[in-house]
């Protein structure tokens, strides 16, 4: 795990940003921890009530993220895909990653990919922001989405 080089998660005042979070319920303890990390960063940035939508699995995340990206300034996608014994893992990971990237580019809305793609459950726990976890990918994804939304807002302002 590369925890080296993690930037500050403080994004400053994002109170004018509308944030949505879509999180799967598969591996619920881990996904709920990711969601809590994202919500904590949102609160620290001045967003008291981000829109939260729960979906069953990771493969459902991109289409819901697309709907949310049409009505929000930033979207955070959270979930867990754990390697199994079949090629299904690769298909799901590719579909989710490609789907989220496409949504972000097609809508010009930041969609932060906080979907963990790991070899085993312990790797997911280590990244979920649970007690004893080395990282909090939910918090990191929220910070990335908010920071990018603020950057895009500045870039879109007419030059005086």
Swiss-Prot record:
What name does the UniProt record give this protein?
6,7-dimethyl-8-ribityllumazine synthase
Statement: the UniProt record of this protein carries the keyword Lipid biosynthesis: no
Q: How does it assemble?
A: Homopentamer.
Which Gene Ontology cellular component annotation is one that this UniProt entry carries?
Answer: riboflavin synthase complex
The EC number(s) this enzyme carries: 2.5.1.78
Instruction: Identify the pathway.
Output: Cofactor biosynthesis; riboflavin biosynthesis; riboflavin from 2-hydroxy-3-oxobutyl phosphate and 5-amino-6-(D-ribitylamino)uracil: step 1/2
Which keywords does UniProt give here?
Riboflavin biosynthesis, Transferase
Q: Which organism is it from?
A: Mycobacteroides abscessus (strain ATCC 19977 / DSM 44196 / CCUG 20993 / CIP 104536 / JCM 13569 / NCTC 13031 / TMC 1543 / L948) (Mycobacterium abscessus)
Residues annotated as catalytic: 88 (proton donor)
Q: Name one GO biological process term.
A: riboflavin biosynthetic process
Please list the reactions this protein catalyses.
Answer: (2S)-2-hydroxy-3-oxobutyl phosphate + 5-amino-6-(D-ribitylamino)uracil = 6,7-dimethyl-8-(1-D-ribityl)lumazine + phosphate + 2 H2O + H(+)
Task: Give binding positions for 5-amino-6-(D-ribitylamino)uracil.
Answer: 26, 58-60, 80-82, 113
Binding of (2S)-2-hydroxy-3-oxobutyl phosphate, residues: 85-86, 127
Q: Which SUPFAM superfamilies match?
A: Lumazine synthase (SSF52121)
What is stated as this protein's family in its record?
Belongs to the DMRL synthase family.
- UniProt GO molecular function: 6,7-dimethyl-8-ribityllumazine synthase activity
Q: What does this protein do?
A: Catalyzes the formation of 6,7-dimethyl-8-ribityllumazine by condensation of 5-amino-6-(D-ribitylamino)uracil with 3,4-dihydroxy-2-butanone 4-phosphate. This is the penultimate step in the biosynthesis of riboflavin.
Which principal EC class is assigned to this enzyme?
transferase
Tell me the name of the encoding gene.
ribH
């Amino acid at each position: 795990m590369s925890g080296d080089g993690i930037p500050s998660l403080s994004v400053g005042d994002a109170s004018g940003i509308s944030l949505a979070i879509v999180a799967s319920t598969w591996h619920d303890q881990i996904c709920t921890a990711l969601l809590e990390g994202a919500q904590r960063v949102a609160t620290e940035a001045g967003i008291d009530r981000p829109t939260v939508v729960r979906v069953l699995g990771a493969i459902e995340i991109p289409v819901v993220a697309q709907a949310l990206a049409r009505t929000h300034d930033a979207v955070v996608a959270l979930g867990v895909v754990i390697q199994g014994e079949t090629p299904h893992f690769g298909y799901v990971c590719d579909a989710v990653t490609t789907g989220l990237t496409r949504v972000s580019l097609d809508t010009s809305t930041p969609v932060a990919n906080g979907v963990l793609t790991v070899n085993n459950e312990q790797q997911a726990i280590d990244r979920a922001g649970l007690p004893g976890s080395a990282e909090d990918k939910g918090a990191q994804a929220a910070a990335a989405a908010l920071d990018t939304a603020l950057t895009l807002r500045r870039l879109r302002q007419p030059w005086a």
